[in-house]
Amino acid sequence: MSAEELTAFQREITEGIPAQLPEPSLRSTGVSHAPVRKDILTEKEKVLALRNALRYFPADQHSELAPEFAAELRQYGRIYMYRLRPSYAMHARPIEAYPAVSQQAASIMLMIQNNLDPAVAQHPEELITYGGNGGVFQNWAQYRLTMQYLSQMTEEQTLVMYSGHPMGVFPSHADAPRVVVTNGMVIPNYSKPDDWERMNALGVSQYGQMTAGSYMYIGPQGIVHGTTITVLNAVRMNDKTGSGPAGKLFVTAGLGGMSGAQPKAGNIAGVVSVTAEVNSEAAYKRHEQGWVDHVIEDVHELTEKVQASVAVKEAVSYAYLGNVVDVWEAFDRAGLFVDLGSDQTSLHNPWAGGYYPAGLGFEEANEMMARDPERFAVHVKESLRRHAAAVNRHTAKGTYFFDYGNAFLLEASRSGADVMNEDGTGFRYPSYVQDIMGPMCFDYGFGPFRWVCTSGKPEDLELTDTLACEVLERLMQEAPADIRQQMDDNIRWIKGAKANKLVVGSQARILYADAQGRMEIAKAFNDAIAAGQLAGPVVLGRDHHDVSGTDSPFRETSNIYDGSAFTADMAVQNFAGDAFRGATWISLHNGGGVGWGEVMNGGFGMLIDGSADAERRLKSMLHWDVNNGIARRSWARNEGAEWAIRRAMEQEPRLKVTMPAHADDALIQRA
């Protein structure tokens, strides 16, 4: 970036909403756009939506903006304020490029821009990062105002974000979070999908997914490690011959922001993978980024190529440009055995672009969901029944199918599909958390720790990989047998991270680690910054999909069996606890993964800068951020969590956790 470009960039950041309006702007071609949202507002509510949008602007601009915003609402179902899109390219820059009084605030600006980078975001011009509706902001005025506040604030202030809206900067103190984010916090009785549609159209609430609305998304890498762990362990659990992953076939769907990790994970795990995707822009975007090997548009050609790859035990990934139902049915007709099956379509949002029904083309479906949502819903339900029936035919032959926490089984059951167990009390297939991620990772405190090198230098990321590997190898020498497999998998992951070319957007890394691993890795980074070995500070974070961050009965807490799976104390306590233990920013969201009204989840970001204060904060906050969830899982009588929290108490004498007594089953039956 030249000096002139940098000056112009910084000027546009600091001016916020410009006093002189930019010229009207059309949507760009060549990028994916959000589908038209359904027309849900009454005429009176449409007037209110327009009034709400205009309050960001002085009254003398209303006559120019009102018809434009009204047209956006009619055409797209939302008011995005396209004319306020910034003139500069949207991507994460080195932290020193951001005009800021507070370095912590500058790091948040970097993370926000990464979430909206067209190489990273699903629908960048609608401010959607992933999942079809996972928003960073509701409109571009909110983006501009937020960036202005961040450029001005000091470390004695906190910016408060209400569902994308910057409510204001309030006095606080240096150890308080710089930003507190909430997304979709609504009265529980008003948390149905149509409530989101209405409130989002009014501009008063948004669905932040997980790392979208919390400024912590790092591209598909953010889920690829967990997906690799899931695929590897699914193979191990079902490998009766001991032949390993080579030649195993994995069928799934979705090449969006999160789901796009699946083919890369399949390659790393060593299987043949087929991932169906109806959106050509998404499929070819992942192919261009090197996240999927081949894109095939004919299901017969796909079948032949997959049969050949399975025969030679090739580790290869195929994207099928079409509907996954067609894949399941074609493979059934061809007698092609599928070892593993799942789905990562955005079924948390089935009626507004999260799931495209079989039998409808992509554009046809987009038009119908906006113009005739009731008819579209009928097609979705029919497709889910057909989808489940095809999966059932494969599982009858021995396929291992698991729900990937995207509400597939939930929405299929609501559509009347044959997905319930024999007594009708649960689903016939497990979620991946029930079988794999919960008992093998979360109960032991392992989850998706991540970091971003704010210098933007690949060599900084390479050094952090080396430091993290050194820490894990040292901890591995004394690791108990209960966690040696997890440690070994994570060491292999970090050693291969550079070769696997995972970076899309910022210089970031994902690594599953437990509390001890996270704290020691973070301290190693902080020491390297202090010693001048790293060129800039590091942002620490995690996915909300973690040990403590999310209460979700159909995903993260689906292996909680004491009746508390539908409670949300853990996620809310985590949000509050991170706030006063040193997080730079914190977030709490309604929804995420399984859907609005189905989940409560939260996350954090922490800037470490080589200081003693940073070391104090990282030790305090990271310890709590993991052990809170282990304690809850232990109280639910999860065996691995009981072991893990006892070990944590031995390592930290100040930690005292209430442990469960186990009642005798026969005694209870006699009572």
Regions found by a protein language model. Give the residues of each.
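Solvent-exposed alpha-helices and their adjacent loops that cap or buttress functional pockets
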Residues: 152-154, 170-174, 189-190, 240-245, ...
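Glycine-rich beta-alpha junction loops
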Residues: 280, 322-325, 344-349, 405-411, ...
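Long, compositionally biased, glycine/small-hydrophobic-enriched stretches that function as flexible linkers
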Residues: 1-201, 205-218, 373-524, 528-541, ...
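Short catalytic-loop micro-motif centered on adjacent basic/acidic residues
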Residues: 249-252, 316-320, 402
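Residue-level detector of anion-binding/catalytic polar loops
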Residues: 272, 337, 400
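Short, solvent-exposed amphipathic alpha-helical segments in soluble enzyme
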Residues: 267-269, 332-337, 417-420, 529-530, ...
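Active-site/ligand-binding-proximal alpha/beta "capping" segment
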Residues: 317-345, 352
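Catalytic or ion-translocation cores adjacent to nucleophile or general acid/base/metal-coordination motifs
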Residues: 208-232, 236, 246-249, 255-313, ...
